[in-house]
From Swiss-Prot:
It holds the Pfam family G-alpha. GTP binds at residues 101-108, 389-395, 415-419, 484-487, 551. Keywords: GTP-binding, Magnesium, Metal-binding, Nucleotide-binding, Transducer. One of its GO terms (cellular component) is cytoplasm. Residues 96-109 are annotated as: G1 motif. The keyword Amino-acid biosynthesis does not apply. This is Guanine nucleotide-binding protein alpha-4 subunit. CDD domains: G-alpha. Residues 480-487 are annotated as: G4 motif. Residues 387-395 are annotated as: G2 motif. Residues 93-579 form the G-alpha domain. Residues 549-554 are annotated as: G5 motif.
Amino acid sequence: MSPSVSSPQLRHTKSNRAISRIDRTDPLALALQPPANEAPADKYARLHQEKLAKQRSDEIDKFLKQHQEDRATHGLASSPSTSVDGANFKKGRVYKMVLLGQAGAGKTTVLKQMRLLYDPPAHERERRGWTKIVLLNLTSSVRVLLETLSLYHDQRLERKSSELSRLESSTSASTSTSASASSPKHVDTESQPNDATRLELAKQLGTTKKINTSSLPWLTHIPSVVQLERALRTELGAFGEEAVLSASSDEAAITNQKVRTRLDAQGSSSIRGEKSPLVLRPGWQERLFTYARRSLSLTQNGRAAAARRETDGGDSQSESEKDNSETLKLLRAIRPEVLALWNDDAGCRALRKRGLFLDGQSDAATSYFLDNYSRITDAAYRPTDEDILHSRVRTLGVTEDVFRVDRSLIYRIYDVGGSRSQRAAWAPFLDDIESIIFLAPLSAFDQPLVEDCSTNRLADTFTLFNQIVTNPLLEHATMILFLNKIDLLEKKLRQGVQLHKYWPEYVGDNDFEAVWRWFRAKFRDALRRAEDEVNLDQTSRRRLYVHTTVATSTVQIRAILMSVKDSILRENLKLTGLVG
């Protein structure tokens, strides 16, 4: 008699046999089968991501089903056009769009604006979840301010030390020459070092020739702010956190030297690379906003219980408030000194005049958050739309959103990561795309690409645009171009940053209107050349819809999105032959 097999073992054996049968007959099942040696932690992570993806898919299906029922209720399902060509009708009803552009161009900000316009309830549900991200952006801005001013004072110290050494060596050389001279010679007293100047420099430098922390007490806050930022990033699940904020001493020295060089450069308009972007792992929206909604529900439904706990001396704070309390405690403690630096410090004013804290120059809108420091750290703080729009979170991978624009139009929008390393992942999402919104940050005309410091950011944008308009898969897609960060471009030009210094082919005036129109013409020429290469006739040529944008301006983007909708309608009518 064969040995008995326990029930769990039998079920496991049958399961493996079933999988083997499926694998032999179904290539898709073979491709999707998890690794045989999958670790428990990897399995848990995979199942969690599959669960989130399934929930998202079910939500979209429910949304589309509800929309179809609404159409049937209004008698639209039986219209001749839908019954004759249901596929084309569905294609026109669910309109596929993709947001393209390099990292930091403003794609995610535009997507936030779309959610605010087309799905206000979802935007409102997520509002509470942005609190921690806003606090992280504020913390990063504080660190940027303190470290930049530290380097500024360090640079001044180096200059004074160099000047003192020069004066001392000059005095020594003069004394030696006078003592060894065999006959008296005329001495130029005007070229002699000024003793008063030398004494003043020596007094300022002191014996250590280091920054006097007693005169700059805010320097002592830098380690605690760095530690707080690291903790917030870790809590949010920032990608690559160890590589970002744990640089070696050699790397830190190199970074400091680069910043010193930029501080010393005349006409420099930004400090680049002073902070790393907040790159969160895939699924951060579900984790953060689901937690925020749960906390909000607990807060709303448990007010009576909270009041009782408070009466009994218990802690009445919600989970979210507890998590943020330590952050707020530190930010409130250093607030007076930071605001005094930001508003009154002479060195900070000098750097601000040179544009070193210009919003959009880095991944944090530094000046925006510092200007709103007091409001954000208030006890009754609640993120505003402006706070959410200015908060920077870099997209990792691809996110998909579905918005009902009106009864007959739904946008399915893909937001893809724009860094060079992520562009290879775009291809699967470009199939059957009907419209492309391409964002070009014009204010980056004088900035290097983060991934390659030898490449100009805007030059990389033109290269990317050329690759898109020459892609055969996208030859029928409507092209919509957002010339973004136009306000920062105007500020730079007014501050005297010369375009021809970075773009020698530009020969016009350093005038805002002339500059942005010149860039618009370059994009149009790029599209025209791409179509000339494939010998398109005049009737088949695409129109490039161009808009100058400030992605954080809700009023402007709302008007532009309405214009985009009209452009889409116009292109659809053209395809049906109803318009020429």
